[in-house]
């Protein structure tokens, strides 16, 4: 079993609280865009936002991965956006873990602000699809590591 660290440096166990989801089967692009969106929010506000994404009522702005992504009239500043429901569910699980960890440490979970949010590449699942004439085509799938670090404000 591998031992995973965190990409956040300067972690203080008294002040900070953290949670992670390792090797989650979601899109790396959607995971990155959600991480950029929720960084700086309180945990309660981020949960409300992602529940809206899950119900396909609130779009997430796609800043980097925006080719062939439709425009959303609800977005301000960045016109391209989408509803990454699967990634939002994964982030909601990690956010609820972060909230529980904050309560366990004695922090006020309503005042915890997300100071570090990351969604980066994990392990690659390699699969091959058989084709005609004895050939095969690769069908690789990238897993994602999700990290959240919060601090009481």
Place the predicted regions along the sequence by residue:
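Extended, charged amphipathic interaction segments
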Residues: 109-132
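Ribosome large-subunit tunnel/peptidyl-transferase-proximal elements
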Residues: 2-108, 149-150
